[in-house]
């Protein structure tokens, strides 16, 4: 509830005051364990920082009236609060680091420096928090040691008091008393040290809430005490329900043995009426986030006091609020400011080399062509070898004269990390200055004055491969010679240093990979069409069939049409040109191809030679399409038939093709599982999963109809839980990627959610993340459904997983999953019986459960230890009361009845008996005639335990088997007579 407030001294107007003390106020330096009391300053306001005052009486009472439990509670709360602070600031640091990676490195952008400065300050603050945590933990260990020493001394004193008195015992008792007193003094000193590390509590007044109890004109006085500190403020209720208070905020220094005492009185003239008094523990406020405290002043809660408490682990001068800083919020807004661009300085070596390379790729008309054959000779050494023609500073300064020759030397700075990073960034994304930015101030500007004033460079002849000539006849300029050994060594070292940086960003798939994925997608569509023709007319299967047909209609049949020329690279174009010579691999002879009048193509498996390629080479005309040779005609018919069957289809985006392949494979696996099972429960689970996959295919079809530049996964993640979008971007390192590798997924999980895993054993974190990856890749609770693509993960699989389990907080979900993984370890350990007994009530309802837990619970029913087996059966019996657990477990165990392993079927049968799953009676009854005697007995007992429904299923299966036996006997008799 919001309350209108007005303060005579708001917190934003000046320095926040320290709380007043009953005995006085020390300076900031006096806070460091000074026990001398100052004169009372009740009459005047406090402008400095109020220190902590451990007076003599306080210290004495602390020595003889120890409260180690309270100190332990403060230690735990302080350590937890510091770790929360560290976690929050670490998250903020990760966010800023991602901003820094996404921001193009440019020394002329002021916002980049602000971001760098913010990151450095945050790193220093995190290091200080880590040091503070280490000090607290070290102090806590020392305190625990002294605590145990005190307890030991007390026990020995008690033992000596019970024994007969003697001289030796009296001396020992004196020594024990001395040691006990020293331990108490050490504990008292440690408590004083701890109080210094407690930080500050900023208490902010938020007003009174009283409904009908608060009337205009009422005056209230609020007194807040914490140990010897106090804060007294007066407030008045205005006619417009606005509340006016003296002060807004006060700073308190927490005490170990002191609690907040809040006293509210109503002031009426010269008298005052006590409204209520409340005590609050200060240990509850050691949290990273601000806490809104609503205190019931009266017993019935008719008047409430609203206070906001913010804990700062350090002094006020070093406070760093957890909320987003102003500099970080203004990063993007500063991009358009005046100082976001400054006049360019002298170009660096990297800029000169990169711009010269772009000049070589530029055509005569000023456009960039990937088909330029002259651009293939671009290299770093070509620029160094022809450095006499390098771009000089006057070209940037826009002088009308010719550029001055400048010799560039490759020194040690070339291999600097920043230079390499700038080089790779420049290759990835080039932002050319606008014409107005590069225009010459003089009217005599010409094309020479443009920023694109470069000369062509080529690789030195001594470094060229055999047969490769990239220097044109018009480029007869003299070039400097370079020692071949030195040049090769320089080029190799440069490539080795830049390989790791470029490899991360240069992951463009090859044309062969794209074709392979497109062919697999086409084959999967054909297989699904065939499979759906044999299935029954179920609503979900109808939708799937309709969606498959829509994909066949929507997807692009020509793989080349989906490529954007502007985004192709030189390597891709080289593959296209080399692919035009596939006819050399064809099965052609001189007799079969006279004067190129007819061409007979053989299936060499190396490449395809279609009509468009022949047209491009001038080997086919309109009249030559109708070949006269019968063999040639048969070859063309066969070629066209194969092309029709194996037509490659694509969405236009490689990662989206991969995602489509994965989900088509999932649909195929689910359809096979649907045919193999005869259980209605399993059918229902598979149908639910198929409906989710149909929705995925609908989204892929909608995305494939967009332009290639507009296809992105960001729209899909906009409605996901908080943090999922940033998490997925880091998994795939791109906004538009629809797939990521499992290694990248696990790395991102470890980075973002490792703090959510409450690891109690070594290796548990990796086990949790691997289990999560397995669950995201799997489909439903059916155990027979296997993984389709174990090496990658799609964004749609992640979305389906979030939808299947109704996840609103991914981090909390991982925390629950970590508990399940720990439960798996407990069920596999010698303490499995204890873990089974603890598994009850809410612990069962919180389970997903995972397939591994269900398998272990079933397996433990046949454990050699009969107590463990009995505990497992009782656990499953208790779990049957949880509807969600029972529904998933019954589907899982019913599907396991089809397993080829006899032991697995036996365990699943016993589990269904414990769960009282009468809906699976038909499937269990089928095991009655199994070859294994134990399995037959378990199936008979399970079916009969289901009551009337089980007996009916048992009788039905018995009749079926009797009819089969009779038919078999008649068949044998007939064979004997014949």
Curated annotation (Swiss-Prot):
Residues 492-509 have a biased composition (Basic and acidic residues). Residues 33-63, 424-447, 465-511 are annotated as: Disordered. Pfam families: PL48 (PF15903). Residues 53-63, 479-491 have a biased composition (Polar residues). Belongs to the RIPOR family. PANTHER family: PROTEIN KINASE PKN/PRK1, EFFECTOR, RIPOR FAMILY MEMBER 3. This is RIPOR family member 3. The lineage of its organism: Eukaryota, Metazoa, Chordata, Craniata, Vertebrata.
């Amino acid at each position: 509830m919001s309350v209108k407030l007005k303060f005579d001294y708001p917190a934003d107007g000046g320095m926040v005051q320290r709380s007043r003390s009953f005995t006085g106020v020390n300076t900031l330096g006096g806070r460091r364990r000074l026990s001398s009391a100052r004169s009372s300053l009740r009459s005047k306001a406090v402008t400095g920082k109020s220190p902590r005052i451990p007076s003599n009486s306080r210290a004495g009472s602390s020595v003889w009236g120890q409260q180690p439990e309270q100190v332990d509670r403060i230690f735990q709360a302080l350590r937890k609060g510091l770790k929360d602070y560290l976690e929050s600031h670490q998250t903020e640091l990760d966010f800023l680091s991602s901003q820094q990676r996404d921001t193009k490195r440019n020394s002329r952008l002021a916002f980049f420096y602000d971001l760098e400065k913010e990151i450095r300050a945050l790193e220093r603050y995190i290091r200080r928090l880590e040091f503070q945590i280490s000090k607290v933990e070290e102090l806590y260990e020392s305190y625990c040691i002294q605590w145990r020493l005190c307890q030991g001394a007390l026990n020995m004193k008690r033992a000596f008091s019970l024994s007969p008195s003697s001289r030796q015992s009296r001396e020992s008792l004196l020594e024990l008393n001395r040691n006990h007193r020293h331990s108490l003094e050490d504990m008292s000193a440690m408590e004083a040290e701890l109080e210094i590390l407690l930080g500050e509590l900023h208490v902010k007044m938020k007003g009174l809430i009283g409904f009908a109890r608060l009337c205009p004109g009422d005056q209230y006085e609020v007194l807040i005490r914490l140990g010897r500190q106090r804060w007294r403020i007066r407030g008045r209720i205005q006619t417009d329900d606005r509340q006016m208070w003296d002060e807004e905020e006060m700073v308190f220094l927490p005490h170990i043995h002191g609690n907040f005492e809040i006293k509210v009185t109503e002031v009426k003239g010269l008298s005052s009426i006590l409204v209520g008094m409340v005590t609050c523990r200060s240990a509850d406020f050691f949290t990273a986030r601000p806490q809104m405290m609503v205190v019931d002043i009266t017993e019935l809660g008719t008047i409430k006091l609203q206070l906001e408490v913010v804990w700062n682990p350090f002094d006020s001068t070093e406070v760093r609020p957890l909320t987003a800083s102003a500099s970080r919020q203004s990063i993007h807004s500063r991009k358009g400011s005046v100082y976001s661009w400054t006049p360019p300085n002298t170009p660096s070596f990297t800029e000169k080399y990169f711009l010269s390379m772009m000049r070589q790729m530029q055509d005569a008309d000023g456009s960039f062509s990937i088909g330029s054959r002259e651009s293939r000779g671009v290299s770093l050494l070509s620029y160094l070898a022809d450095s006499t023609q390098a771009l000089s500073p006057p070209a940037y300064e826009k002088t009308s004269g010719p550029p001055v020759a400048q010799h560039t030397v490759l020194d040690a700075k070339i291999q600097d990390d920043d230079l390499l990073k700038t080089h790779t960034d420049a290759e990835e994304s080039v932002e050319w200055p606008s014409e107005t930015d590069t225009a010459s101030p003089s009217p005599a500007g010409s094309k020479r004055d443009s920023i694109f004033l470069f000369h062509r460079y080529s690789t030195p002849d001594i470094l060229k491969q055999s047969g490769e000539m990239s220097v044109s006849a018009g480029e007869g300029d003299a070039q400097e010679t370079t020692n071949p050994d030195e040049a090769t060594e320089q080029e190799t070292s440069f490539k080795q240093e830049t390989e790791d940086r470029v490899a991360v960003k240069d992951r463009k798939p090859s044309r062969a990979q794209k074709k392979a994925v497109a062919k697999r997608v086409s084959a999967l569509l054909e297989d699904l069409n065939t499979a759906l023709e044999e299935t029954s007319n179920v609503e979900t299967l109808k939708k799937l069939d309709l969606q498959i047909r829509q994909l066949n209609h929507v997807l692009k049949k020509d793989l080349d049409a989906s490529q954007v020329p502007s985004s192709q690279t030189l390597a891709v174009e080289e593959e296209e040109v080399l692919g035009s010579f596939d006819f050399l691999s064809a099965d052609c002879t001189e007799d079969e191809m006279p004067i190129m009048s007819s061409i007979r193509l053989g299936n060499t498996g190396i490449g395809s030679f279609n009509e468009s390629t022949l047209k491009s080479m001038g080997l086919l005309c309109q009249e030559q399409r109708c070949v006269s040779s019968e063999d040639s005609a048969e070859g063309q018919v066969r070629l066209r038939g194969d092309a029709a069957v194996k037509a490659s289809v694509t969405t236009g985006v490689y990662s989206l093709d991969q995602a489509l392949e994965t989900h088509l494979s999932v649909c195929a696996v689910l359809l096979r599982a649907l045919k193999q099972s005869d259980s209605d429960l399993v059918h229902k689970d598979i149908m639910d999963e198929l409906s989710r996959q149909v929705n995925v295919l609908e989204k892929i079809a909608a995305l494939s109809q967009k332009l290639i530049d507009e296809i992105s996964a960001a729209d899909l993640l906009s409605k996901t839980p908080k943090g999922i979008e940033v998490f997925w971007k880091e998994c795939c390192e791109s906004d538009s990627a629809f797939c990521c590798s499992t290694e990248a997924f696990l790395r991102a999980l470890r980075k973002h959610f490792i703090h959510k895993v409450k690891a109690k054993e070594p290796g548990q974190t990796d086990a949790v993340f691997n289990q999560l990856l397995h669950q995201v890749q799997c489909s439903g609770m059916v155990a027979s459904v296997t993984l389709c693509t174990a090496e990658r993960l799609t964004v749609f699989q992640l979305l389906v997983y979030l939808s299947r389990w109704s996840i609103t907080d991914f981090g909390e979900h991982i925390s629950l999953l970590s508990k399940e993984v720990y439960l798996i370890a407990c069920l596999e350990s010698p303490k499995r019986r204890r873990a089974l007994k603890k598994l009850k009530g809410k612990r069962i309802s919180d389970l997903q459960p995972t397939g591994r837990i269900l398998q272990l619970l079933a397996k433990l029913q046949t454990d050699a230890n009969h107590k463990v087996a009995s505990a497992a059966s009782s656990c499953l019996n208790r779990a049957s009361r949880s509807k969600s657990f029972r529904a998933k477990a019954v589907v899982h165990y019913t599907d396991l009845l089809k397993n080829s392993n006899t032991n697995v079927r036996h365990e699943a049968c016993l589990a269904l008996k414990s769960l009282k799953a009468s809906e699976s009676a038909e499937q269990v009854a089928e095991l009655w005639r199994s070859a294994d005697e134990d399995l037959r007995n378990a199936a008979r007992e399970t079916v009969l335990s289901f009551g009337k429904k089980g007996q009916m299923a048992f009788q039905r299966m018995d009749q079926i088997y009797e009819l089969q036996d009779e038919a078999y006997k008649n068949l044998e008799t007939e064979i004997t007579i014949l």
